[in-house]
């Protein structure tokens, strides 16, 4: 698959893994236009793509955020922003008393986010759900390898990047000799976009 037009190699390298993971999450959730999706970890690379793809799919999106990330989430298209911190599920229920139709759990909140989902809703996590199944919620794990060799999906994502539906966010790039610096930054948390190692 060719890189999106008018992008650098560094920018283009941020597309495949996280956008495919985000697309898979939404496909696993199986939500329909006008349904409501909650996203945890929205400011991150995965969460940002989930938000933008969900909006392109016609979903209403609610996400939690620190005040410092509020402008970013607004630029990604989030409809409702709630404060990050304890009580995620309760804050979601304040906005949607019956619960949301699905959650893409990029921040790995696991059981602390379940109460935000309505009975019979959907929950997917990037590392697999840790907790007890309940209330007929459909729990899935988003493993990007499920979309290995799915050329048509990646081509669509490329086109969406070209059209501005998806934003290719580079947090920073480092040379191969400074790869440890990238790992140090990732371990510190708070990365917005992808760290890229240049070869």
Over which residues does each language-model region extend?
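Terminal helix/beta-alpha structural elements that buttress the NAD(P)+-binding lobe
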Residues: 1-199
């Amino acid at each position: 698959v060719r890189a999106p037009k008018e992008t650098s190699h560094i920018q283009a390298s941020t597309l495949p893994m996280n956008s495919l993971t985000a697309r898979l999450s939404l496909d696993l959730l199986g939500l329909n236009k006008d349904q409501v999706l909650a996203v945890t970890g929205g400011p991150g690379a995965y969460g940002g793509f989930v938000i933008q793809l969900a909006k392109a799919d016609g979903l209403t999106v609610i996400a939690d955020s620190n005040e410092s990330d509020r402008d970013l989430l607004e630029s990604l298209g989030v409809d409702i922003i709630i404060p990050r911190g304890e009580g995620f599920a309760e804050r979601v229920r304040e906005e949607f008393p019956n619960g949301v139709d699905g959650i893409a759990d990029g921040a790995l909140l696991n059981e602390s986010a379940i109460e935000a989902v309505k009975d019979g809703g959907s929950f997917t996590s990037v590392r697999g759900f840790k907790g007890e199944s309940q209330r007929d919620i459909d729990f899935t794990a988003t493993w990007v390898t499920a979309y290995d060799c799915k050329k048509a999906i990646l081509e669509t994502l490329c086109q969406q990047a070209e059209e501005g539906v998806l934003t290719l966010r580079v947090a920073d790039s480092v040379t191969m000799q400074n790869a440890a610096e990238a790992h140090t930054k990732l371990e510190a948390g708070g990365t917005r976009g992808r760290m890229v190692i240049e070869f």
